[in-house]
Amino acid sequence: YFIGEGSSAAAYLCIDFAGEASYETLQGSWKSDLPYAVVHRMAISGAYRGHGIASIAFQLIEELCIQKGIYSVRVDTDEKNAIMRHVLEKNGFDYCGTIWFDNSVKYAYEKMIKRDAGVNGAV
């Protein structure tokens, strides 16, 4: 998915609803065993960093999940990516443990979406 303003791309992200095999090896505990969406990658254009685009992206992800009847979102990020870990925690994601993916340790996060949340009402 792309988030843009006019002809400018502000952000790019990949959302997958098929699960992630490496999440089965979590060293820790997921918040739920419900079907979930995975945000595989998110990149914000340098011109748009610090403008809340990541938070807008997560709101849109939650709205898409609600439309699909999915109430769990999982994300992993490199252990050294303090900025993304901050963005995840700021947007209500809880740290669940670590996984081994792509030859490195990743920090894994999950957020539960309220079932009665509507558009712009997800938590």
PLM feature segments, named:
Residues 1, 35-37, 105-109:
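Short beta-strand micro-motifs in enzyme catalytic cores
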Residues 76-77, 89-108:
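Conserved catalytic-core motifs of GNAT/GCN5-like acyltransferases
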Residues 49, 75-85:
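Conserved beta-strand-loop-alpha-helix junction that forms the acyl-donor binding cleft
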Residues 42-44, 77:
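Hydrophobic adenine-recognition pocket in adenosine-nucleotide-binding enzymes
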Residues 58, 65-77:
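Conserved GNAT acetyl-CoA-binding A-motif
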Residues 14-41, 49:
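Conserved acyl-donor/pantetheine-binding loop and adjacent beta-alpha core of acyl/acetyltransferases
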Residues 1-16:
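Conserved beta-hairpin
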Residues 44, 50-63, 86-90:
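Conserved acetyl-CoA-binding loop-helix of GNAT-fold acetyltransferases
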